[in-house]
């Protein structure tokens, strides 16, 4: 794939952009097999590949420059000058067109980007999410205060007329002078408050603050793989810890008698419940609880426990708790293989029966890994 930003060295986030994709896959595969050296080579399944371009459904743009010449993108690592990334080839063509329009719309609307040195201005970030199923967008303006809302509201009709696919628009208030992406307060500027996405026939509800996978093509295969593994095992009861908006639980519910999804973020749980209602699933229960606290409060484990923790992993305490609960099966999905490997050391009673990785972020070193662990 050719990327002008990478060739000009203005953005080097995709560190392996110049490496042929087949070679990227081979390098990652070898690195993961080396990291998990205790896993039998025969346990590894073929990796799930990504499209090399137009594969991301989310864009997180820093608002830079001045009101008369705003830029959506990043700061140059050389001299700090603003670099526009609105035409990043990882985004869909529709997303690129909308981002380019927004960059000009911000200028004509007179919305000043926030200057972190002078601590002046309003617009900090523009966050864009696209539903591949419906082609609709959720657009969030992260601003320092409510001072910019009047200008945003006044100019919204022009934006919506130009891009009617923008279904959800909100302003997130982030007043703190820190490199924090978003604040607590979300002000909706449209009647619609969420997007509808669909993977493998399963509806998914996407709200502003809920975590959602960035690569829909690969995410769909991740969920389908977990569903297929669970379908083979046919557990009586299954827990989905760190369930987010319910992607794994919703896919696996038809193949278990009872599924319980646990997630600390209430907004994500509300999304998961709405998806379950749309599917008409009655053997699935979601609760807004801390996954570690829920697990530690149980005296008897489910037949199968699926975990999908954040980058920090499960940690020693929760890993040891799962070891003591002695569930027959664990499915561990991880966005950080290093912490996953550390957690597996605290699960000595389990053998890795199946391992597969998913190239969620092509052209980088990152990989999503999922393993089926069986109690020995």
From Swiss-Prot:
<dbReference type="InterPro" id="IPR029063">
    <property type="entry name" value="SAM-dependent_MTases_sf"/>
</dbReference>
<feature type="binding site">
    <location>
        <position position="3"/>
    </location>
    <ligand>
        <name>[4Fe-4S] cluster</name>
    </ligand>
</feature>
<feature type="binding site">
    <location>
        <position position="242"/>
    </location>
    <ligand>
        <name>S-adenosyl-L-methionine</name>
    </ligand>
</feature>
<keyword id="KW-0479">Metal-binding</keyword>
<keyword id="KW-0949">S-adenosyl-L-methionine</keyword>
<feature type="active site" description="Nucleophile">
    <location>
        <position position="335"/>
    </location>
</feature>
<feature type="binding site">
    <location>
        <position position="11"/>
    </location>
    <ligand>
        <name>[4Fe-4S] cluster</name>
    </ligand>
</feature>
<dbReference type="InterPro" id="IPR010280">
    <property type="entry name" value="U5_MeTrfase_fam"/>
</dbReference>
<dbReference type="GO" id="GO:0070475">
    <property type="term" value="P:rRNA base methylation"/>
</dbReference>
<comment type="similarity">
    <text>Belongs to the class I-like SAM-binding methyltransferase superfamily. RNA M5U methyltransferase family. RlmC subfamily.</text>
</comment>
<feature type="binding site">
    <location>
        <position position="263"/>
    </location>
    <ligand>
        <name>S-adenosyl-L-methionine</name>
    </ligand>
</feature>
<comment type="function">
    <text>Catalyzes the formation of 5-methyl-uridine at position 747 (m5U747) in 23S rRNA.</text>
</comment>
<feature type="binding site">
    <location>
        <position position="308"/>
    </location>
    <ligand>
        <name>S-adenosyl-L-methionine</name>
    </ligand>
</feature>
<dbReference type="InterPro" id="IPR011825">
    <property type="entry name" value="23SrRNA_MeTrfase_RlmC"/>
</dbReference>
<feature type="binding site">
    <location>
        <position position="213"/>
    </location>
    <ligand>
        <name>S-adenosyl-L-methionine</name>
    </ligand>
</feature>
<keyword id="KW-0489">Methyltransferase</keyword>
<dbReference type="GO" id="GO:0051539">
    <property type="term" value="F:4 iron, 4 sulfur cluster binding"/>
</dbReference>
<dbReference type="Pfam" id="PF05958">
    <property type="entry name" value="tRNA_U5-meth_tr"/>
</dbReference>
<keyword id="KW-0004">4Fe-4S</keyword>
<protein>
    <recommendedName>
        <fullName>23S rRNA (uracil(747)-C(5))-methyltransferase RlmC</fullName>
        <ecNumber>2.1.1.189</ecNumber>
    </recommendedName>
</protein>
<feature type="binding site">
    <location>
        <position position="88"/>
    </location>
    <ligand>
        <name>[4Fe-4S] cluster</name>
    </ligand>
</feature>
<feature type="binding site">
    <location>
        <position position="14"/>
    </location>
    <ligand>
        <name>[4Fe-4S] cluster</name>
    </ligand>
</feature>
<keyword id="KW-0411">Iron-sulfur</keyword>
<dbReference type="GO" id="GO:0070041">
    <property type="term" value="F:rRNA (uridine-C5-)-methyltransferase activity"/>
</dbReference>
<dbReference type="GO" id="GO:0005506">
    <property type="term" value="F:iron ion binding"/>
</dbReference>
<dbReference type="InterPro" id="IPR030390">
    <property type="entry name" value="MeTrfase_TrmA_AS"/>
</dbReference>
<keyword id="KW-0408">Iron</keyword>
<keyword id="KW-0808">Transferase</keyword>
<keyword id="KW-0698">rRNA processing</keyword>
């Amino acid at each position: 794939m050719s990327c002008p930003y990478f060739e000009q060295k203005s953005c080097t986030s995709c560190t392996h952009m110049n490496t042929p994709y087949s070679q990227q896959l081979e390098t990652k595969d070898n690195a993961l097999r080396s990291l998990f050296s205790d896993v039998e080579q025969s346990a590894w399944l073929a990796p799930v590949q990504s499209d090399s371009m137009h594969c991301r459904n989310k864009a997180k743009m820093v608002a830079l420059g001045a009101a008369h010449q705003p830029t959506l993108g990043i700061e140059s690592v050389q001299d700090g000058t603003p670099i526009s990334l609105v035409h990043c080839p990882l985004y869909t063509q529709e997303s690129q067109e909308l981002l380019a329009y927004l960059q000009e719309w911000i200028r004509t609307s007179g919305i000043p980007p926030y200057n972190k040195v002078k601590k002046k201005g309003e617009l900090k970030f523009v966050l864009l999410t696209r539903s591949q199923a419906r082609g609709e967008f959720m657009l969030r303006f992260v601003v320092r205060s409510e001072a910019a809302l009047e200008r945003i509201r006044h100019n919204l009709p022009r934006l919506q007329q130009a891009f009617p696919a923008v279904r959800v628009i909100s302003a997130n208030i982030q007043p703190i002078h820190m490199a924090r992406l978003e604040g607590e307060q979300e002000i909706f500027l449209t009647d619609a408050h969420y997007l509808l996405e669909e993977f493998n026939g399963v509806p998914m509800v996407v709200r502003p603050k809920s975590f959602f996978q960035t690569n829909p093509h690969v995410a769909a295969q991740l969920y389908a793989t977990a569903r297929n593994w669970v379908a083979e095992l046919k557990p009586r009861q299954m827990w989905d810890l760190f369930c987010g908006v319910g992607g794994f639980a919703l896919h696996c519910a038809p193949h278990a008698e009872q599924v319980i999804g646990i997630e600390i973020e209430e907004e994500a749980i509300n999304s998961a419940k709405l998806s379950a209602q749309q599917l008409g699933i009655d053997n699935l229960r979601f609760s807004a609880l801390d996954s570690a606290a829920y697990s530690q409060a149980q005296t008897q484990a489910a037949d199968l426990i699926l975990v999908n923790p954040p980058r920090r992993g499960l940690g020693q305490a929760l890993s040891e708790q799962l070891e003591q609960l002695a569930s027959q099966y664990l499915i561990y999905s991880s966005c950080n293989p290093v912490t996953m490997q550390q957690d597996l050391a605290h699960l000595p009673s389990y053998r890795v029966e199946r391992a597969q990785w998913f190239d969620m972020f092509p052209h980088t070193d990152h990989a999503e890994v999922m393993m089926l662990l069986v109690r020995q």
